[in-house]
Every structure is written in C-alpha cells, then in structure tokens.
C-alpha cells in the first residue's frame, strides 16, 4: 500500500523522469539554463515547479551541495570532517543544517549524489515512512486500513508534508512515523528485534540534524507514545500522571542508547558550539512576525488565496471530520486526540503568527524556531487525528450537530472574508476558491450526517477518505522539473575555473553563478558559506573586510541585488583569492570590480564574468618576518602579523626578525599533496621563516615538521602559520577532532554493550523456552 500511494502521488517522478531534487529550481550555477518540466496531473491554475516549495534556498544551496561533497569525499576515500571548499575551510558535519551525517545524505552520496539518486532515496524514505504509519495505525492503534490510508494522505499532502519530504527542514518530519512506530511497538510487545529497531530508528533521527524541527518532532513523538502507554497500562496503581511519568521514563531507554551510539556525531557539535560565534547566537534573535487574516485563511486551504507562497495548510475536511468524531471516540482515542489538538492547534497558532499567541514563540529558546517550522507539528497532529476520526466514523459515526455548526461557522467566515476582499478591492480571495471550499464543507457535513445509519458507516468512512484525498490532492503542485545534474554540463566559466584555479580560491558574487555551497560541487574553493557554525574569527574578518555592506546569518555576496563591492583588496590577497566570479545581474558590484581587476573570462551565455587577481598570496608561502604589531588592512607576504604569544616566542627563539631586511630571501613552499583533512608541503627555507598556509585556522588542526609536532598560530587575522627551520623539510597539516575520537569510543562501547545485552537476553529466553 505504501508503494502504491507513492506511485499514485508521484507518477511524473516514477514514470516520466521528474525530479525531487531541487537542483534547477533556483538559477544557481547558470541562471540562463532552461530545464524541461514534466507533469501527469493538471494544475489549476498552471504553476511553476517551484511554487509552494518552502525554504528552497536551503535545499539548493545547502542540502544538494552536501550530498555531492560527501559523495566526492567517499569516491576519493577521504574524510569529510573538514570542508576545504567553503569559507576558506570550514567545519564538516558540525554545520548541522546540511545534514552531512544523516541517513538521507549518506545514502544519496553512496548512490552517486545524482538527481536520480536524490529522487529515489527520497521516495524510499517516504515509502518507509508510509509503511510505518500504516503499521502504527493498524497494529498499534488498531484503527483499520481505511483509517490508515487517511492518515497517510494527511502525512503526505498537508502543507508541510507536501513541501518538506525532500528537504533538510522536512527530514525529521519524514522520519517521525518510523521513530513513533518502532518506539510504540517496542513498548507494546517488547523483544530484542523491536528494541534494536527502535534504537536504530532513533539513532537515524538524531543524525538528521535539522535541530529546530527535530526537537519539535521529538516532543510530538514522546507525547503520543506516552499517551498510548498510559492508556494501555494494565495497572491501576497511581494517577494517570504517575503512569505517564513511568511510561516516559521507560521510553528514555531508547534515546539514551541512541545518544550513546551517535556520540561520534553530536560530541563534536558540542565542541564546536563552545567555540561558536554570532551566527549561532543569531538563531536566538529571531522574532515571529504578525500575520494578516488572509494568511490564516490560507492555512486552512490554499484555495482561499491567490498567493503562490507556501503556507503549512491542513485542509478543511480534516478539521471538520476530526471535530465531529471527537465525542464518539473511545477513551484512549480521546486522549490521543486531546494531545494532538493541544500540540497541533498551538503550533498552528504560532505558525499563523496570531497576536498574543505569537508572543509565546518569541520566548527565549522558542524564538529560534522559525514560524514555518511550527507547521511540522500541526501536520503530524493532523496525520494522527484524521486516522482516528475516520476510524470512529466507520465504527460509530460522527456528531452531526458539531459538523453542521462547524460547517456553518467556517463557511460564514469564508464568505465574510470573500465579501471584505470584494468590498476593499484586494483581489486576494478567488471566487472559485471560495466556492470549492464551501463544496468541501457541504461534503463533510453530508458524510457526517449520513453516518447515523450504521449500515452505511464503512462506505462513508471510505467517502471521507475520498473527500480528504480530493481536497488535499488538489492543493498539490504536480509540475516537476526533469531530473538534471548541473555539474554534468557545466557552463564555460566553471570549466575555465577548474582548469586554472590550482591552489587558489574564488570570490563569488551573485546567485546565478557559484553561490555557496556550490564551489564544493565542482571542487572550486571559495570564501563564502551558506552554512552555520562558522569559525568566529573568519566570520568577523569576512564581515569587516570582504562584504561589510551585507551582514547576515550567512557569509554571502549578492543576497541583495544592490550590494556594492567594498572588499579590501589586501584581505582578498590574504585568502589567496585568484579570481572574482561575478553574476552580471549585480551591475553595481561588477562595475566596481572591473575598475580594479582585469577581465580573465567572459561567459556571455551564462551572464557571468571572471576577473583575475594577480596579487593574491600563494596558498602556501614563506614569510621572513613575524610581528605582534597588528596593522589591519596592511597585510604582506614579507611581514606576517599575529597576536599568538607562543608563535611569537617560537619565532624569536628561531631568530626570525619583526621587520624585513633589504636583502631578505624567502625560499619556497610547495604543496605536494592536499586532501580534505591534510596538507603536505615541501619547504626549502634559506633561513628560519614563518610558513603561512592561507586556510582558515581552527583549533582541531595540528602540524608537524618532519614528523615532529609544532605549534600552529593564527596569523593575518584568520589563517595558519608555523615557524620552520632553515633547510629542506616536509610540513604536514592534519585535521583531527579529539571530540570525535572520544565520541567514537563512546559509540563503539555503546554498540558493544548493546550487542552483549542482546546476545545474553536472547540466550536466556531460548534457555527458558
């Protein structure tokens, strides 16, 4: 059934080569490229493939590049603990938002990171989620298959589900049925296989590191699991609150073991947080904006607005059916409905930005959850509630009075909104949408009123599912881009850069070229990043010297079309920026760059120009002098600056001067080999010098000279420097996270303990049998 639902929902993907990969939806790499659209079901009205897609930038600029970077690393048998292509060197899995260690990214990377791999791995996860959801409704809650189908439709076609199944934001939502089912089945029946399944699902969920939605889903999962446990408890000792607390305590076994198994992933994150800067802190500075009344209408049904912008709608029929079934539900079902209503309505109010309610979302901690993330909870609550509602209708019917009064109230509200829209001339609420919404209301009322006849209830339950399917399915955007891999046919400027970049970097300005993180896709190092957990000194350097006019959460150039070139040329030299890649839509920026740098390549077809910086410092070079005097904007290859006392002491002991003599000789430094996490440099120094590597300095990097460890200092504000002796030597820089090593020990120990427990328990049970 799960596979059938997937095929019916996405025939253009399964049969016509449609893509669930977001590559091509945004004009990244080549803004002038045209991609074919495929479609089976009609859209009314016709829509662009990206209409209704939430947080498209996170998919195109974070998730897709992450899959391709991880694939490149796997293919080259390299670690992806460090990303040398982003922000002059940046953290790997600790960036969280791009999910590098998630099961989804790892599987996509394993299968080649193509649009086809992305698409079918996404479909596989959806099918698995739908299977677990069906089993949860049929086996755990015993609601029946018709009700299970209703829940699956709500899971897939409510606003958050429809938009989020192939995104980093929606990844925890896709996994929630798997975690919920395995957890509740283990609590219901026990057994080693179910225990291991629950732990594996929970561990995969932890590795899916889009934290805001992840935490919201965990709250929902444990709330539902605890409610089911409490309702199923055989003992009558103590209050329901005590039974709930005992149940929750028992559930904690699963996350405790899963946390131990995934320590290799989360322990480095906490280590990175200790050194994090303003980019992470800015998440706590968000505010939930107020929302117009028409947006609130669109949350019920997209029919009620002409806007194509995504909103986490839940539908009209689901709300009416859930409300009408409440009074006839079983006690356990009422408890679950009450929890779903409390969580779902609260989340929906925060998502809508309702006055007064939104002030709760602005409390410390909660304010880090963006408004659209709250709709994940309302979608999950609708999924569970609708399945219960359809099951109740099939068994006992529903409350006709509630349905009638609710239908009248909702219908009156829609009519009133439409009349206000007409009187004020807004043209925001379409007539067709208003009529369609009223038709759904009438259909729901008729189904509920007819359910008073016991002989018709099974058929009416099926009719209720059909009504929900028609309503929610009509909201979907059925247009898809054909599968495309942008790196398969790169534009001419990308090929030029790949041939000429060598050990240098690029500055990229604009969204139509190599907007971050797309440098990592093509193996072209860049100085920007669209990931968080940025190295604080680098973030400060970038915002002060590279792009002072466009400060935001991410380090980007061209987020605003009117941005101008204000980069300090010396700062670009420090970072070994050999080429400036400019999207020609940024006319003021391009004009200023053209005055200072010579044109190296003009890709008229892609509307991208590449300028050459002939004064860029080599990626590795010897500097004859080191000074503790900080002179911002006066960086030089001849005199390196630092505030690192140990490095200054080492330089003084080696006889390295603080100024440059007239006849100073520098020697040479040549990079012999470079991977994601190591750099080997052949050094020939005429006298003791400072070896500068123009990669971002971070505390997890170590260095050795001919196998002997040496101290690394941060020089020229952001890059690495060590003192090297006279003569020939081999310098090796290595990235090693001690936190990850400790985490790996914990993970292996947990795995061993779990295996031992499973083995001993299984043998004991066999002996008893």
Predicted regions and their residues:
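Start-transfer (signal-anchor) and selected internal transmembrane alpha helices
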Residues: 1-15, 25-45, 246-250, 445-465, ...
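Active-site lumenal/periplasmic loops and adjacent helix-entry segments of GT-C-fold
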Residues: 14-175, 209, 213, 297-306, ...
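Periplasmic/ER-lumenal interhelical loops and adjacent helix-loop junctions
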Residues: 28-53, 60, 65-74, 247-328, ...
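Membrane-interface helix-loop junctions at the exits of transmembrane helices
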Residues: 7-18, 74, 78, 95, ...
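Selective detector of the "anchor" transmembrane alpha-helix that sits immediately C-terminal
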Residues: 110-136, 316-324, 740-765
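Contiguous transmembrane helix-bundle modules in multi-pass membrane proteins
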Residues: 150, 168, 174-175, 182, ...
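Active-site-proximal, structured, solvent-exposed surfaces of multi-pass membrane proteins
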Residues: 78, 82, 344, 528, ...
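Extracytoplasmic
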Residues: 22-41, 466, 470-666, 680-682, ...
């Amino acid at each position: 059934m799960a596979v059938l639902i997937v095929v019916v929902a996405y025939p253009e993907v399964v049969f016509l080569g449609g893509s669930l990969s977001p590559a091509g939806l945004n004009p990244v790499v080549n803004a002038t490229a045209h991609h074919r659209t495929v479609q089976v079901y009609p859209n009314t009205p016709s829509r662009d493939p990206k209409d209704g897609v939430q947080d498209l930038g996170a998919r195109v600029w974070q998730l897709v590049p992450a899959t391709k970077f991880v694939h490149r690393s796997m293919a080259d048998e390299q670690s992806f603990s460090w990303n040398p292509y982003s922000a002059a060197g940046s953290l790997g899995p600790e960036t969280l938002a791009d999910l590098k260690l998630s099961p989804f990214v790892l599987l996509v990377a394993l299968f080649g990171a193509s649009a086809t791999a992305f698409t079918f791995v996404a479909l596989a996860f959806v099918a698995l989620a739908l299977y677990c959801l069906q089993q949860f409704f049929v086996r755990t809650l015993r609601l029946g298959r018709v009700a299970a189908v209703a829940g699956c439709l709500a899971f897939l076609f409510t606003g958050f589900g429809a938009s989020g199944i192939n995104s980093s934001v929606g990844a925890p939502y896709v996994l929630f049925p798997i975690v919920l089912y395995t957890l509740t089945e283990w609590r219901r029946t026990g057994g080693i296989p179910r225990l291991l399944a629950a732990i594996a699902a929970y561990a995969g969920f932890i590795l899916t590191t889009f934290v805001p939605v992840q935490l919201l889903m965990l709250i929902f999962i444990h709330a539902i699991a605890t409610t089911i446990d409490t309702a199923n408890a055989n003992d009558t000792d103590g209050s329901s609150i005590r039974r709930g607390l005992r149940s929750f305590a028992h559930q904690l076994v699963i996350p405790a073991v899963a946390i131990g198994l995934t320590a290799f992933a989360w322990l480095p994150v906490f280590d990175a947080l200790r050194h994090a800067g303003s980019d992470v802190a800015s998440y706590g500075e968000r505010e939930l904006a107020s929302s117009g009344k028409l947006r609130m209408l669109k949350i019920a049904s997209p029919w009620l607005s002409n806007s194509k912008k995504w909103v986490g709608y839940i539908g009209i029929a689901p709300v009416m059916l859930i409300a009408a079934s409440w009074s006839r539900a079983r006690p356990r079902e009422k408890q679950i409905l009450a929890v779903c209503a409390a969580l779902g309505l609260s989340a929906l109010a925060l998502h809508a930005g309702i006055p007064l309610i939104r002030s709760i979302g602005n409390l410390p901690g909660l304010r880090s959850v963006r408004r659209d993330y709250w709709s994940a909870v309302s979608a999950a609550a609708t999924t569970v509630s609708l399945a219960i509602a359809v099951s109740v209708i099939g068994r006992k019917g529903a409350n006709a009075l509630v349905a009638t009064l609710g239908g009248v109230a909702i219908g009156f509200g829609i009519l009133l909104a439409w009349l206000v829209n007409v009187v004020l001339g807004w043209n925001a609420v379409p007539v067709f949408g208003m009529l369609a919404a009223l038709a759904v209301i009438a259909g729901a009322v008729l189904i509920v009123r007819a359910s008073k006849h016991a002989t018709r209830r099974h058929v009416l339950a099926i009719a209720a599912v059909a009504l929900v399917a028609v309503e929610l399915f009509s909201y979907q955007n059925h247009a898809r881009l054909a599968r495309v891999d942008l790196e398969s046919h790169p534009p001419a400027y990308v090929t030029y850069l790949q041939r000429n970049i060598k050990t240098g970097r690029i500055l990229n300005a604009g969204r139509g070229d190599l907007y971050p993180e797309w440098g990592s896709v093509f193996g072209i190092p860049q100085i920007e990043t669209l990931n968080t957990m940025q190295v604080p000194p680098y973030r400060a350097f970038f915002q002060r010297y590279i792009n002072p006019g466009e400060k935001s959460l991410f380090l980007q150039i061209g987020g605003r079309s009117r941005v101008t070139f204000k980069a300090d040329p010396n700062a670009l030299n420090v970072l070994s920026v050999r080429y400036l890649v400019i999207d020609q839509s940024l006319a003021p920026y391009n004009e200023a760059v053209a005055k200072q740098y010579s044109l190296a390549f003009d890709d008229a077809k892609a509307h991208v120009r590449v300028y050459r910086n002939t004064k860029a410092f080599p990626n590795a070079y010897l500097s004859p002098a080191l000074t503790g005097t900080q002179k911002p904007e006066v960086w030089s290859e001849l005199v390196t600056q630092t505030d690192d006392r140990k490095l200054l002491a080492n330089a003084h002991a080696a006889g390295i001067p603080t100024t440059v003599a007239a006849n100073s000789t520098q020697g040479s430094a040549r990079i012999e080999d470079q991977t994601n996490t190591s750099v080997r440099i052949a050094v020939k120094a005429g006298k003791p010098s400072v070896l500068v590597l123009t990669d971002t300095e971070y505390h997890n990097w170590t260095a050795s000279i001919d196998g002997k460890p040496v101290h690394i200092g941060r020089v020229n504000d952001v890059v690495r420097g060590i003192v090297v002796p006279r003569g020939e030597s081999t310098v090796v820089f290595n990235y090693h996270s001690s936190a990850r090593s400790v985490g790996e020990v914990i993970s292996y120990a947990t795995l061993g303990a779990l295996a031992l427990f499973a083995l001993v328990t299984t043998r004991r049970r066999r002996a008893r049998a």
